[in-house]
């Protein structure tokens, strides 16, 4: 049975080092897809690289935790900026859902302006679209636009979210992350998906070259390790040996 593997590199547009790492992992590795932060410091650079790398599918990385929003969000920003206090607001059930829905539309339109096409799919920075209050908004938007959505099946099940609310891959893994990233860890995510009988799987990753912006991230040097693993010839062979075809969200 053929299986589809989507290797999605998050954070396109975060920095030039991030952008170059993603392009390298696509051209010389197993990365097939990326998602872009339209308010990122290097988003124009990302759009330029994306146009010269047509084999890289580009989706939208919805941002509610970093930088400045594209629209006025007085209910979520502090001093005009987004931040991780969104978790506290979610726990307090005080999220400004109308503002979030409007910002989602603004970021979508900005994506189309930058890249010249619709995103292949939507996910989000720090997985905020999987919050119980935000998920229905993003899922309905993706369905309306006819595009796919990253769905973390485990989180959705725990939160009682409708897993059929939007088109998605059968499985999703965020486990290729952290100080211990390795080829073995990557392949373990594939083997676990095979054991679950999933015909399609998205593996999240963050390959990058380190620059000043990345050095300011809590997740820094492992991005280099990810790049090494994702561009290893042995990994591509092992993926094929397991019956996977490298693909994108257009294939699900």
From Swiss-Prot:
GO terms for cellular component: cytoplasm. One of its GO terms (molecular function) is deacetylase activity. It is an enzyme of class 3 (hydrolase). Pathway: Glycan degradation; chitin degradation. Its EC number is 3.5.1.105. Keywords: Carbohydrate metabolism, Chitin degradation, Cytoplasm, Hydrolase, Magnesium, Metal-binding, Polysaccharide degradation. It comes from the Bacteria. InterPro entries: COD_ChbG_bac, Glyco_hydro/deAcase_b/a-brl, YdjC-like. It holds the Pfam family YdjC. Mg(2+) binds at residues 61, 125. Its cofactor is Mg(2+). It is found in: Cytoplasm. Gene3D superfamilies: Glycoside hydrolase/deacetylase (3.20.20.370). It catalyses: N,N'-diacetylchitobiose + H2O = N-acetyl-beta-D-glucosaminyl-(1->4)-D-glucosamine + acetate; diacetylchitobiose-6'-phosphate + H2O = N'-monoacetylchitobiose-6'-phosphate + acetate. GO terms for biological process: chitin catabolic process; diacetylchitobiose catabolic process; polysaccharide catabolic process. Involved in the degradation of chitin. ChbG is essential for growth on the acetylated chitooligosaccharides chitobiose and chitotriose but is dispensable for growth on cellobiose and chitosan dimer, the deacetylated form of chitobiose. Deacetylation of chitobiose-6-P and chitotriose-6-P is necessary for both the activation of the chb promoter by the regulatory protein ChbR and the hydrolysis of phosphorylated beta-glucosides by the phospho-beta-glucosidase ChbF. PANTHER family: CARBOHYDRATE DEACETYLASE, YDJC DEACETYLASE FAMILY MEMBER. Homodimer. Belongs to the YdjC deacetylase family. ChbG subfamily. HAMAP family: COD. NCBIfam families: PRK02134.1. This is Chitooligosaccharide deacetylase. The lineage of its organism: Bacteria, Pseudomonadati, Pseudomonadota, Gammaproteobacteria, Enterobacterales.
